Amino acid sequence: MAEAVIQIEVVYASVQRQVLMTLDVPAGSSVRQALALSGMDREFPELDLAQCAVGIFGKVVADPSTRVLEAGERIEIYRPLLADPMEIRRLRAARAREKRTLPG
């Protein structure tokens, strides 16, 4: 009897390009196992799948080694932030204040 498989998607977007791949993985596979099967680290050599944050449909997966996948789920590999979001908001607010206080 053939092993049951499920179909999932794995997605990653670098600055230069985006890849969305559909994979058939054994039923009961963890997120970590599916990432290893995806070969995304071969597509993007700078990617360290053991260290990257990952999520499923926008929700971060706390422990990819234990989270079992269901058919149709999409694993998203997240890049590290380049800037602190709080600092960006602070700078944007300061620029807006300057514009309001300028004469003319």
From Swiss-Prot:
Pfam families, alphabetized? Ub-RnfH
Top-level lineage group? Bacteria
Homology family: Belongs to the UPF0125 (RnfH) family.
UniProt-recorded name of the protein: Protein RnfH
- Organism of origin is Pseudomonas savastanoi pv. phaseolicola (strain 1448A / Race 6) (Pseudomonas syringae pv. phaseolicola (strain 1448A / Race 6))
